[in-house]
Amino acid sequence: MALRFIDLHTHSTASDGSFSPSRLVGEARSLGLAALALTDHDTLEGLDEAERAVQEKGTRSPDFSFEFIRGCELSSRCGPAEAHILGLWIGREERDVSDLKEKLAEVRAQRFRRNVAMAEKLRGLGFAVRLEDVEALAGGEVVARPHFAALLLRMGVVKSVRE
């Protein structure tokens, strides 16, 4: 039996990933992965699109089978430390996810407040950063620190996103 690989921690454009959920499924299948979990940050938004892509492509090919796992990466705090917890095999039915969706909405509201604070801090340091510009740069993705870094790079404030 050939050795097969799985990826249980991936992100799509529903949070801070580079590929749409459907493209991520296609890439995973083309790499021959046995299973893929979509675990976007604090959202379930990409799961249905990814599942549709799996259904369209099928779960079997002549060479291998493929399993899609519904997941989410949950942001949490433990004192001053931030923790990321993977939730896997998340249900499809509203009754299965209503409490989780409520909690995720709270987390997204906290993230929005953090983004407002980051934009204000950068303006206080003399950089003309508006949250609207960061959101436009994110192109519908969940706005996060990398988008602020990309805007600062575009403005010529830094030489790299890492900086």
Each language-model region and where it sits:
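An N-terminally biased module of ancient metal coordination in phosphate/nucleic-acid-related enzymes
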Residues: M1-A81
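Extended substrate/RNA-proximal surfaces in nucleic-acid metabolism proteins
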Residues: K57-E163
